[in-house]
Amino acid sequence: MSKIAIVDYGMCNLWSIKSAIQFIGYDSILTSDPKDILNSSAIILPGVGSFKTGMDNLLSLGLSQAIIDACMFRSIPILGICLGFQLLCCSSEEPSYTKGLSLLPIQIVPLCRHIDASFVLPHVGFTSVYTSKNDPLFKNIANKSDFYFVHSYGAFNVPHDFTTYSYCNYDAKIISSANVNHIMGVQFHPEKSQTNGLILLDNFLSFSNV
């Protein structure tokens, strides 16, 4: 039976994600068991808060290796949301240099490094997202649709050969999402992004064949 695993590592209110998934017609489980991750059909890694705390929690629960093995050796699709997206990346400087899961070749840095002091940080609220053609996450979503953000750290660059990513403009171009095959991440919160967010979640789960 197909199983959607929402990773519970103590970093956010998971019920908003679970409720959104239920609203669009899917069942899911909240889990901190590595076996559930490895035996799932799709993984959702949400999160709010400190990158270092998030990685420490994943490591202490045995979830970091389970996520890597599930994605790299079993090709299980994963969607990282907000902090979850950042944890999929190579590293973050929050609060100091910390290694991530290294499933996406991206570095996370403070927004204030590239954004003028006249702009309010953290970046909070609905912001238009500029999408790539043929991105499965944004199927049936118009380019420059609004999604809900809340973050103080983010990515400003992706590798030159990346063809599937999106960005928003908040004084500087901030990476809003990035995909490498079945490994996907979004900086915004789809569960707080109204209809567009629900469509995006449905797109991910349809891509995952759950």
From Swiss-Prot:
Pathway: Amino-acid biosynthesis; L-histidine biosynthesis; L-histidine from 5-phospho-alpha-D-ribose 1-diphosphate: step 5/9. CDD domains: GATase1_IGP_Synthase. It is found in: Cytoplasm. Keywords: Amino-acid biosynthesis, Cytoplasm, Glutamine amidotransferase, Histidine biosynthesis, Hydrolase, Lyase. GO terms for molecular function: glutaminase activity; imidazoleglycerol-phosphate synthase activity; lyase activity. IGPS catalyzes the conversion of PRFAR and glutamine to IGP, AICAR and glutamate. The HisH subunit provides the glutamine amidotransferase activity that produces the ammonia necessary to HisF for the synthesis of IGP and AICAR. This is Imidazole glycerol phosphate synthase subunit HisH 1. It comes from Parasynechococcus marenigrum (strain WH8102).
